[in-house]
Amino acid sequence: MNSQKQILNQEVIDAVAEKQQEVFDIKFQNIIYYMENKSKIIYQEKSVPIDFLKATSEMNSLDWTDKYNHIGFDNLSKTGECVQFIRQGEDKWYAEVPILKNGRWTRYTWISYSDTKTVTNMLRLFFEEVPWFGMLSWKMRRFKH
């Protein structure tokens, strides 16, 4: 009986270790974030690191009744990519990807509208540093200001 209990305990420990490794694999990338949400402001220049779990928590906390709410993520390592979100409703998101040339914004962005589940799945891929752009249907937009 004791050996069966030990085997079961080891299986549970192995399963937990495997899950922790999965979280670790996407958790510690060189990604920073910036946001504005009512009384909480984090400036892009501060280069505050973030992991996927914290990112989803911050996104869930965005108050869509605040017209200035937004959150953005910059991958400072491998991809150099950036993605930004504005929460427009409980399950409604505006997403944008600035188009850069030689590290400078061209005044063009890719924009899309989606739901929480799709945006979260896309963000997971962003943090895993695998192709994520195809998760949403994008349109190009030019900013004139």
For the regions a language model picked out, list residue spans one by one.
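Acidic, proline/glycine-rich low-complexity IDRs
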Residues: 3-52, 62-68, 76-82, 86-145
